[in-house]
C-alpha cells in the first residue's frame, strides 16, 4: 500500500509537470500493483452462472496472463474471465491453439486502436473444425451495480444509458472483442486494443 501511495503521489507530480512518459510508466506500475492486490480478493468459486445456451463455448472461470508477441515488441495481457468468461475463454482457447500466430494487424487507427485476429483467407473468424462453422461469442456486459452478466444485449437495450461497465475501455492497452456493425453476437476471433 505504501508503494501504491508513492505511485499516486508521483502520478500527481508527473501530471502537473506534463511528463507523459513517466506518467504512463508509473501508471502501469501502479496498475500492476493494484492487479496483484485484486488477486487476494478474488472469489474461490465462480460467482455466477452462464446461460446453458452457451455451454458449447470455451470459458475462463478466473484470470489468466497471456504473452502477446508482435514485431514491435512483446506485451503481457491479463485476461479477465470473472467479468467476461466466454470472451476470455474464446481468447485463451484460440491463443492455446496458436490461432493468432503470425496474423497481421488488420486494422490500425493512429492513436486509437489496433486490431488483429482475422484469419488468412476468406473467413473472418475462427472455424470450428468439429462443425465447419464459424464460432460466435456473444456480447457480454457486466455492470458493477448488477448481480449478473448480460448476454447479447447492449447498454441501450438494457436501459443503462449512463452506466460504466465493470471493464471500461479507459486504459492504454485495454483489450476488447470485435463484433460486426450488424450483429452483437458474431464476435469470433478478432480482438483490438486501445492505444490511448
What is the meaning of each model-derived region?
Residues 1-196:
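Cross-family detector of peptidyl-prolyl cis-trans isomerase
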Amino acid at each position: 500500500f505504501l508503494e501504491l501511495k508513492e505511485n499516486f503521489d508521483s502520478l500527481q507530480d508527473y501530471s502537473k509537470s506534463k511528463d507523459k512518459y513517466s506518467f504512463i510508466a508509473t501508471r502501469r506500475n501502479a496498475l500492476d500493483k493494484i492487479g496483484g492486490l485484486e488477486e487476494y480478493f478474488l472469489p474461490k468459486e465462480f460467482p455466477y452462472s452462464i446461460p446453458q445456451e452457451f455451454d458449447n463455448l470455451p470459458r475462463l472461470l478466473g484470470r489468466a496472463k497471456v504473452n502477446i508477441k508482435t514485431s514491435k515488441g512483446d506485451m503481457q495481457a491479463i485476461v479477465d474471465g470473472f467479468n467476461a468468461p466466454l470472451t476470455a475463454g474464446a481468447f485463451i482457447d484460440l491463443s492455446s491453439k496458436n490461432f493468432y500466430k503470425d496474423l497481421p494487424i488488420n486494422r490500425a487507427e493512429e492513436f486509437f486502436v489496433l486490431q488483429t485476429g482475422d484469419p488468412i483467407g476468406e473467413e473472418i473468424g475462427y472455424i470450428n473444425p468439429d462443425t465447419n462453422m464459424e464460432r460466435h461469442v456473444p456480447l457480454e456486459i457486466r455492470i458493477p451495480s448488477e448481480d449478473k452478466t448480460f448476454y447479447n444485449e447492449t447498454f441501450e437495450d438494457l436501459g443503462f444509458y449512463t452506466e460504466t461497465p465493470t471493464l471500461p475501455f479507459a486504459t492504454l492497452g485495454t483489450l476488447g472483442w470485435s463484433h460486426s456493425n450488424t450483429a452483437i453476437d458474431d464476435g469470433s476471433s478478432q480482438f483490438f486494443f486501445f492505444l490511448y
